[in-house]
Amino acid sequence: MVNYKDLGLVNTKEMFAKAIKGGYAIPAFNFNNMEQMQAIIKAAVETKSPVILQVSKGARQYANATLLRYMAQGAVEYAKELGCPNPQIVLHLDHGDTFETCKSCIDSGFSSVMIDGSHLPYEENIALTKKVVEYAHQFDVTVEGELGVLAGVEDEVSSDHHTYTNPEEVIDFATRTGCDSLAISIGTSHGAYKFTPEQCTIDPVTGKMVPPPLAFDVLDAVMEKLPGFPIVLHGSSSVPQEEVETINKFGGALKAAIGIPEAVSYTHLTLPTTSRV
């Protein structure tokens, strides 16, 4: 058993509490190799931002659990080397689909895990999420649950349709599972290729394809039901800036999960950006 605190990592509890108070979101980047991790940490230090390093089950299998653990520890030391004396870095399992996967990550030094039971019937999702929470909280590891299904493909996670989160279920789900944050579905999409042409409309002025609009009414209703509770939006890497501003008006998303396509280089990752979730 390796405790994440021995690696210099933190969980999301204090990080999210500060974000709620400060009115900002925490970026969560999926990474698959050393170059991506270097770029993420460099950008986080330069912008003085806490950051969540996300790893899918497939990426963990590819990297090797032991090597990945030391990469995360190395990320903390790299941030210090770059001038950040107290790095706020989370190592998070993205879309864990079984209790066994989540337990394995917790036992090997992850500070946060996601259990995605959104494909299950509601009561089964609650039971699975609660089981993970009960184990994780013994070691002060935070847990993200999910209600609703995102379309798109990301590693083993795939769906050809959206199922928006039902706002009437969020209080019951959060209360009964004890999860620390909740991923919801409002129309964002997994993967590098977000929408098919059939899902888009054509802008009559520019002639460009426009993706389907996000369901801000769902976000608004969820925020009303769970004020001050950490809310997560997955598939956020291609949300336009004007949509980000609208999300912020509704109270923002406390965690924005951002995937990095394999073709994106270190140079591109470290270019200046004006986008802020």
Q: What is the predicted function of each stretch?
A:
Residues 267-273:
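Conserved small/polar residues in nucleotide/adenosyl-binding loops
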Residues 26-29, 51-53, 89-93, 113-115, ...:
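Hydrophobic faces of well-ordered beta-strands that scaffold small-molecule active sites
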Residues 100-104, 240-247, 265:
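Catalytic cores of alpha/beta
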Residues 50-99:
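Active-site cofactor/substrate anionic-group-binding motifs, chiefly glycine-
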Residues 2-25:
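N-terminal amphipathic alpha-helix/helix-capping segment at the start of soluble metabolic enzymes
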Residues 65, 194-197, 241-248:
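Histidine/acidic-residue-rich catalytic or RNA/ligand-binding cores of hydrolases
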Residues 115-122, 254-261, 265:
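Glycine-rich phosphate-binding active-site loops on the catalytic face of alpha/beta enzymes
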Residues 34-50, 70-78, 98-119, 130, ...:
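Alpha/beta enzyme core
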